[in-house]
A protein has these predicted regions:
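Bacterial N-terminal signal peptides
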Residues: 8-17
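Short sequence/structural segments immediately N-terminal
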Residues: 22-369
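Positively charged n-region of N-terminal signal peptides that target proteins for export
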Residues: 1-6
Length: 369
């Protein structure tokens, strides 16, 4: 017996032939909805409540029209940022100019990514579940699809969850919490326990007026809906040029060695090119200052400019102190390598601690570092 969804689909398509253009597209969309209401009802429900449905953006606009029955599911196209760009070009261009678009490249660039259990890498709850927001090449997409990792290719749906694709959802700090939490990136814990986050929660509970100031992640990092998310300080708060403070410059150089960007002699390595490609660090004063100025302007909407500048300088000073502690730890472990107490792993380029191995560092003391 033929699949009833297939029979329904063909019958509706036959009727669609009577109406050209938009009417035909609408009939085809109705066929998708009728079939998927029995298979994936919540997907249909989300779409029906979306701005897409309200504006008559049908299933085939994102998934194509080749998939017509349960027997040809593989013909359904999976959305990518380019799909979204057909209507949201400005937002996709902004996204690709920001750090979120580089998340996939950053995950693949780490030296021990391939060491991780495949269940961790391929699952939605593992590292790549969040890093999948990054832009991917056509070849990378094909490889992921071949492994059955086809969800989340659109990147946009990391924040605008499919198939509602809600701007309201993506405008909430809870959308950011999905990835920006935990011991290795505790931004949610810092925000929710700070004054900004507390006021946002009080406002949500109705304890504050709806027009009360309660800055969210998006308020400060996506002003006016700009999707080009970027910060002044990069990964591990490393940037160039080196500071004028000689001690701080020396400590920063040690950290760059620990990141493998410089070799133990202080000379640039091939990793510097990866840092440039993934924009892991701000590599000029001009680039750093641009982001700092933008943040001061944002803060000044609620605070005096002098207050904003002073608080940001306090943060800079905290980084200076933390750099000193980090550099001391790196030099201590480097000394253990130099004295032969720790042996150089075969996969290491130098007898020197590698910070990018994170929890995969070969010794307990390095893991603590």
């Amino acid at each position: 017996m033929k699949n009833p969804c297939s029979i329904l689909f063909m019958a509706v398509l036959a009727l669609a032939a009577l109406w050209p253009g938009e009417a035909s597209a609408q009939v085809q969309s109705e066929a998708c909805v009728r079939c998927h209401k029995t298979i994936t009802p919540h997907i249909v429900g989300d779409w029906q409540n979306s701005s897409h449905a309200e504006n008559e953006v049908s299933c085939d606009a994102c998934h194509g029209s080749d998939h017509r029955s349960a027997g040809d599911v593989e013909k359904a196209q999976l959305a990518t940022p380019d799909t979204c760009a057909s209507c949201h070009q400005q937002q996709v261009d902004q996204f690709r100019a920001g750090k979120h678009a580089l998340a996939w490249a950053a995950a693949q660039a780490l030296p021990t990514t391939h060491w991780q259990p495949m269940t961790l890498l391929e699952g939605m709850e593992g590292c790549t579940g969040c890093h999948k927001i990054g832009d991917k090449s056509d070849q990378q997409i094909k490889e992921l699809e071949a492994k059955g990792q086809s969800y989340g290719m659109a990147s946009c749906d990391a924040c605008h969850t499919r198939h509602l694709f809600s701007t309201k959802e993506a405008s909430s700090p809870l959308a950011c919490r999905t990835c920006h939490m935990g011991i290795d990136h505790p931004q949610w814990e810092m925000y929710s326990g700070a004054k900004h986050g507390v006021r946002w929660q009080l406002k949500a509970f109705g304890e504050l007026p709806q027009d009360a100031a309660a800055p969210t992640c998006q308020t400060c990092l996506m002003e006016n809906g700009d999707h080009a998310v970027m910060t002044a300080w990069g990964f591990l708060a490393v940037r160039l040029p080196l500071p004028e403070d000689k001690e701080w410059a020396q400590n920063r150089t040690t950290i760059l060695k620990g990141l493998g960007v410089l070799n133990p002699q202080g000379e640039p390595t091939a990793r510097l090119d990866l840092v440039k490609q993934a924009k892991i660090a701000r590599l000029s004063q001009e680039v750093w200052q641009k982001e700092r100025n933008k943040m001061v302007r944002t803060c000044s909407q609620c605070h005096a400019k002098s207050f904003a500048e002073n608080e940001l300088r306090k943060g800079d000073n905290m980084i200076r102190i933390a750099d000193g502690l980090m550099a001391e730890g790196i030099r201590t472990v480097a000394g253990l390598y130099q004295d032969g107490i720790l042996r150089k792993p075969e996969n290491y380029s130098f007898a020197y601690p590698d910070l990018l191995t994170f929890q995969d560092a070969p010794t307990g003391i390095e893991q603590e570092l």
